[in-house]
Protein backbone atom coordinates (compact mmCIF):
# COMPACT_ATOMS: atom_id res chain seq x y z
CA UNK A 1 0.00 0.00 0.00
CA UNK A 2 1.31 3.47 -0.88
CA UNK A 3 0.81 6.78 0.90
CA UNK A 4 2.46 9.89 -0.53
CA UNK A 5 4.69 7.65 -2.70
CA UNK A 6 5.98 5.93 0.45
CA UNK A 7 5.27 2.32 1.28
CA UNK A 8 3.46 1.70 4.55
CA UNK A 9 4.76 -1.58 5.89
CA UNK A 10 2.92 -4.05 8.03
CA UNK A 11 4.01 -5.09 11.48
CA UNK A 12 4.93 -8.52 10.12
CA UNK A 13 7.17 -6.97 7.45
CA UNK A 14 8.87 -4.77 10.03
CA UNK A 15 9.43 -7.74 12.33
CA UNK A 16 11.02 -9.68 9.45
CA UNK A 17 13.30 -6.72 8.71
CA UNK A 18 14.42 -6.63 12.34
CA UNK A 19 15.11 -10.37 12.35
CA UNK A 20 16.97 -10.37 9.02
CA UNK A 21 19.00 -7.21 9.45
CA UNK A 22 18.79 -5.59 12.88
CA UNK A 23 21.75 -3.26 12.23
CA UNK A 24 20.25 -1.91 9.01
CA UNK A 25 16.88 -1.48 10.71
CA UNK A 26 18.47 0.44 13.61
CA UNK A 27 20.41 2.67 11.19
CA UNK A 28 17.18 3.36 9.30
CA UNK A 29 15.54 4.43 12.54
CA UNK A 30 18.35 6.93 13.10
CA UNK A 31 18.06 8.32 9.58
CA UNK A 32 14.28 8.62 9.85
CA UNK A 33 13.22 6.00 7.27
CA UNK A 34 9.46 5.75 6.84
CA UNK A 35 9.11 2.27 8.39
CA UNK A 36 9.80 3.99 11.68
CA UNK A 37 6.69 6.17 11.44
CA UNK A 38 3.37 4.88 12.74
CA UNK A 39 0.18 5.17 10.72
CA UNK A 40 -2.07 8.12 11.32
CA UNK A 41 -5.86 7.90 11.64
CA UNK A 42 -6.35 9.37 8.14
CA UNK A 43 -3.87 6.88 6.63
CA UNK A 44 -5.51 3.90 8.32
CA UNK A 45 -8.99 5.07 7.35
CA UNK A 46 -7.84 5.46 3.73
CA UNK A 47 -6.57 1.87 3.82
CA UNK A 48 -9.90 0.67 5.21
CA UNK A 49 -11.90 2.63 2.63
CA UNK A 50 -9.85 0.99 -0.10
CA UNK A 51 -10.14 -2.47 1.47
CA UNK A 52 -13.93 -2.22 1.80
CA UNK A 53 -14.38 -0.30 -1.46
CA UNK A 54 -16.23 2.52 0.25
CA UNK A 55 -16.18 6.20 -0.63
CA UNK A 56 -15.91 9.04 1.85
CA UNK A 57 -19.44 10.15 0.86
CA UNK A 58 -20.80 6.70 1.73
CA UNK A 59 -18.99 6.89 5.06
CA UNK A 60 -20.49 10.33 5.74
CA UNK A 61 -23.98 8.99 5.04
CA UNK A 62 -23.54 5.87 7.18
CA UNK A 63 -21.94 7.64 10.17
CA UNK A 64 -24.47 10.48 10.22
CA UNK A 65 -21.55 12.88 10.71
CA UNK A 66 -21.27 16.22 8.93
CA UNK A 67 -19.35 16.32 5.69
CA UNK A 68 -16.95 18.97 6.99
CA UNK A 69 -16.23 17.01 10.19
CA UNK A 70 -15.39 13.82 8.26
CA UNK A 71 -13.15 15.71 5.84
CA UNK A 72 -11.38 17.32 8.81
CA UNK A 73 -10.71 13.82 10.19
CA UNK A 74 -9.34 12.67 6.83
CA UNK A 75 -7.15 15.76 6.49
CA UNK A 76 -5.78 15.27 10.01
CA UNK A 77 -7.23 18.58 11.26
CA UNK A 78 -9.53 16.86 13.79
CA UNK A 79 -8.70 14.11 16.22
CA UNK A 80 -11.88 12.02 16.50
CA UNK A 81 -13.15 10.82 19.87
CA UNK A 82 -13.48 7.15 20.72
CA UNK A 83 -17.24 7.23 20.00
CA UNK A 84 -16.68 8.88 16.62
CA UNK A 85 -14.17 6.14 15.76
CA UNK A 86 -16.80 3.61 16.83
CA UNK A 87 -19.37 5.21 14.55
CA UNK A 88 -16.88 4.90 11.71
CA UNK A 89 -16.14 1.27 12.65
CA UNK A 90 -19.83 0.36 12.58
CA UNK A 91 -20.44 2.26 9.35
CA UNK A 92 -17.60 0.31 7.71
CA UNK A 93 -18.56 -3.00 9.37
CA UNK A 94 -15.06 -3.39 10.81
CA UNK A 95 -14.21 -6.43 12.85
CA UNK A 96 -12.98 -6.20 16.44
CA UNK A 97 -9.29 -6.36 15.49
CA UNK A 98 -9.64 -3.56 12.93
CA UNK A 99 -11.56 -1.47 15.45
CA UNK A 100 -8.95 -2.07 18.15
CA UNK A 101 -6.24 -1.05 15.66
CA UNK A 102 -8.21 2.09 14.79
CA UNK A 103 -8.23 2.94 18.52
CA UNK A 104 -4.50 2.27 18.75
CA UNK A 105 -3.75 4.53 15.79
CA UNK A 106 -6.13 7.17 17.18
CA UNK A 107 -4.55 6.87 20.63
CA UNK A 108 -7.83 5.89 22.28
CA UNK A 109 -8.45 3.21 24.87
CA UNK A 110 -9.09 -0.27 23.50
CA UNK A 111 -12.41 -2.04 23.90
CA UNK A 112 -12.26 -3.97 27.15
CA UNK A 113 -14.70 -6.88 27.62
CA UNK A 114 -14.93 -6.39 31.40
CA UNK A 115 -16.54 -2.99 30.78
CA UNK A 116 -20.25 -3.62 30.15
CA UNK A 117 -20.65 -1.07 27.34
CA UNK A 118 -17.44 -2.21 25.65
CA UNK A 119 -18.55 -5.84 25.84
CA UNK A 120 -21.87 -4.87 24.25
CA UNK A 121 -20.05 -2.96 21.51
CA UNK A 122 -17.78 -5.95 20.87
CA UNK A 123 -20.84 -8.18 20.49
CA UNK A 124 -22.35 -5.72 18.01
CA UNK A 125 -19.10 -5.54 16.03
CA UNK A 126 -18.84 -9.32 15.99
CA UNK A 127 -22.41 -9.60 14.71
CA UNK A 128 -21.74 -6.91 12.05
CA UNK A 129 -24.67 -4.82 13.26
CA UNK A 130 -25.29 -1.45 11.64
CA UNK A 131 -24.85 1.79 13.53
CA UNK A 132 -28.63 2.09 13.97
CA UNK A 133 -28.96 -1.50 15.22
CA UNK A 134 -26.09 -0.93 17.63
CA UNK A 135 -27.67 2.28 18.90
CA UNK A 136 -30.97 0.46 19.49
CA UNK A 137 -29.20 -2.38 21.32
CA UNK A 138 -27.20 -0.03 23.55
CA UNK A 139 -30.33 1.89 24.51
CA UNK A 140 -32.20 -1.37 25.20
CA UNK A 141 -29.60 -2.31 27.83
CA UNK A 142 -29.47 1.21 29.29
CA UNK A 143 -26.00 2.02 27.97
CA UNK A 144 -24.86 5.28 26.41
CA UNK A 145 -25.47 5.29 22.66
CA UNK A 146 -23.17 6.41 19.87
CA UNK A 147 -25.51 8.89 18.21
Kindly give the residue locations of the regions a language model identified:
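General nucleic-acid-binding
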Residues: 1-34
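Short, charged recognition helix plus adjacent turn
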Residues: 2-15, 100-129
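A short, Lys/Arg-rich alpha-helix, primarily the initiator
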Residues: 21-55, 134-146
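The alpha-helix within a helix-turn-helix
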Residues: 49, 60, 89
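Short alpha-helical "recognition helix" segments of helix-turn-helix
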Residues: 55-62
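Recognition helix of helix-turn-helix/homeodomain-like DNA-binding domains
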Residues: 64-80, 105-107
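Short, basic-rich loop-to-helix N-cap that marks the start of a DNA-contacting helix
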Residues: 77-91
Amino acid sequence: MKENNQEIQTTKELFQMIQQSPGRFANGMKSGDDFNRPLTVPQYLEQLLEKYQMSISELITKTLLSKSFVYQIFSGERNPSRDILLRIAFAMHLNIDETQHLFLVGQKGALYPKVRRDAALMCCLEQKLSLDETEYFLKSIDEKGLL
